[in-house]
Amino acid sequence: MLRRKPTRLELKLDDIEEFENIRKDLETRKKQKEDVEVVGGSDGEGAIGLSSDPKSREQMINDRIGYKPQPKPNNRSSQFGSLEF
């Protein structure tokens, strides 16, 4: 394997400005998210979510990930299709 000398990277003024803009955007988003959490936390939702029964906890998780469970049918025709016994 051939070795080569490290390539020098030049830091330009445009790069610094872009970095500062992105950092400011991230900070404002973080502050907005914290403000929403503080307002949501004062409603008491956090305390209810922690102390509630497992069914509602499971339901909260399913809602968060977008999972909508379908009830399983219990009759034989749905399990075996159109087979006749």
Swiss-Prot record:
Question: How is the subunit organization of this protein annotated in UniProt?
Answer: V-shaped homodimer. Interacts with CDC16. The mammalian APC/C is composed at least of 14 distinct subunits ANAPC1, ANAPC2, CDC27/APC3, ANAPC4, ANAPC5, CDC16/APC6, ANAPC7, CDC23/APC8, ANAPC10, ANAPC11, CDC26/APC12, ANAPC13, ANAPC15 and ANAPC16 that assemble into a complex of at least 19 chains with a combined molecular mass of around 1.2 MDa; APC/C interacts with FZR1 and FBXO5. Interacts with FBXO43.
Region feature (Disordered) = 30-85
Q: What does this protein do?
A: Component of the anaphase promoting complex/cyclosome (APC/C), a cell cycle-regulated E3 ubiquitin ligase that controls progression through mitosis and the G1 phase of the cell cycle. The APC/C complex acts by mediating ubiquitination and subsequent degradation of target proteins: it mainly mediates the formation of 'Lys-11'-linked polyubiquitin chains and, to a lower extent, the formation of 'Lys-48'- and 'Lys-63'-linked polyubiquitin chains. The APC/C complex catalyzes assembly of branched 'Lys-11'-/'Lys-48'-linked branched ubiquitin chains on target proteins.
- The name of this protein is Anaphase-promoting complex subunit CDC26
Give the subcellular location: Nucleus
| Key words, A-Z | Cell cycle, Cell division, Coiled coil, Mitosis, Nucleus, Phosphoprotein, Ubl conjugation pathway
Q: Which residues form a coiled coil?
A: 7-38
Its annotated pathway? Protein modification; protein ubiquitination
The UniProt entry, under InterPro entries, shows:
APC_suCDC26
This protein's major location comes to nucleus
